[in-house]
From Swiss-Prot:
Keywords: Biomineralization, Cytoplasm, Glycoprotein, Nucleus, Secreted, Signal. The lineage of its organism: Eukaryota, Metazoa, Chordata, Craniata, Vertebrata. GO terms for biological process: biomineral tissue development; inflammatory response; odontogenesis; odontogenesis of dentin-containing tooth; positive regulation of epithelial cell proliferation involved in wound healing; positive regulation of gene expression; regulation of actin cytoskeleton organization; response to wounding. Residues 236-258 have a biased composition (Polar residues). Residues 1-15 form the signal peptide. Residues 126-128 are annotated as: Interaction with ARHGEF5. Residues 107-124 have a biased composition (Low complexity). This is Odontogenic ameloblast-associated protein. It is found in: Secreted; Cytoplasm; Nucleus. It comes from the Eukaryota. Residues 103-124, 230-278 are annotated as: Disordered. The gene is Odam. Interacts (via C-terminus) with ARHGEF5.
């Protein structure tokens, strides 16, 4: 119905007698209005290739004006009109209607006029292909889906980066106290020995160096040694509470230079090596 209404509006606008010369149109209403004064009905002519949808060519208009002024009945050869009709593939179904319309005579204009609108209605949906853009839009939409499907790839990175952080923190807790106090990393206690890690934590508070770091925990003193050694030389005159059962605070109030540090450090190394050989 919309197509029929549009065709009616276009035919009404194009049939207005604004120009005195005869012009080709998609319907026969324009020619009928121009020839009402003469009282004659002309046979249908080739009017499909040059309708209101297609802009007219300037060269054809000049030829049409000359022929209209000379004879009043313009006639185009079929060969030239078919060549021009081939340039417009959307108007091919209209060119087939012309062969039937040319068979009409001057005495039968109403019969041909009733058939041409029905044929134009059947051919109009064939000439215009509207749903061509639908598959293109669907293909474009499918191209965007992989972008959103790749979003969860951030999760495996979090699991990968979190695993070395745990190992780094464990190594940091085990090795840092020995770097600050002794300046070197001694061999740590085996993980299977019970109480080995507890001795390492207590040494950081007391400040004493054990002779055998792999010794298991027994009742009594934790590390039987001759003399405790204090390594905190910077904090002179400051006493800190210790967690050992028998605290010894004799070496905390010493002078800035402790002469017992230098000779005792190599002795600890010799005693540790002699105990590990057998």
């Amino acid at each position: 119905m919309k197509i029929i209404i549009l065709l009616g509006l276009i035919g009404a606008t194009s049939s207005a007698p604004l120009i005195t010369q005869r012009l080709l149109s998609a319907s026969n209403s324009h020619e009928l209005l121009l020839n009402l004064n003469n009282g004659q009905l002309l046979p249908l002519q080739f009017q499909s290739a040059f309708n209101s949808w297609i802009p007219p060519f300037p060269g054809l208009l000049q030829q049409q004006q000359q022929q209209a002024q000379v004879s009043g009945h313009p006639q185009f050869p079929l060969s030239t009109l078919e060549s021009f009709a081939g340039l417009f593939p959307n108007q091919i179904p209209f060119s087939r209607q012309v062969g039937f319309a040319q068979g009409g005579q001057a005495g039968q204009p109403d019969f041909s006029q009733q058939q041409t609108p029905s044929q134009t209605q059947q051919a109009s949906p064939m000439s215009y292909v509207v749903p061509v853009k639908v598959p293109q839009d669907q293909t474009q939409m499918f191209q965007y889906y992989p972008v959103y499907m790749l979003l969860p790839w951030e999760q495996p990175q979090q699991t990968v980066t979190s695993s070395p952080q745990q190992t780094g923190q464990q190594l940091y807790e085990e090795q840092i106290p020995f770097y600050n106090q002794f300046g070197f990393v001694p061999q740590q206690a085996e993980p299977g020995v019970p109480g080995g890690q507890q001795h390492l934590v207590l040494d950081s508070f007391v400040g004493t160096a054990p002779e055998t770091p792999g010794m298991p925990a027994v009742e009594g003193p934790l590390y039987p040694q001759k003399e405790p050694i204090g390594f905190k030389q910077d904090n002179v005159g400051v006493s800190t509470p210790s967690t050992s059962p028998k605290p010894d605070t004799g070496n905390f109030f010493t002078s800035e230079i402790n002469p017992t540090i230098a000779p005792l450090l190599p002795e600890q190394k010799v005693n540790a090596d002699s105990l590990r050989e057998p």
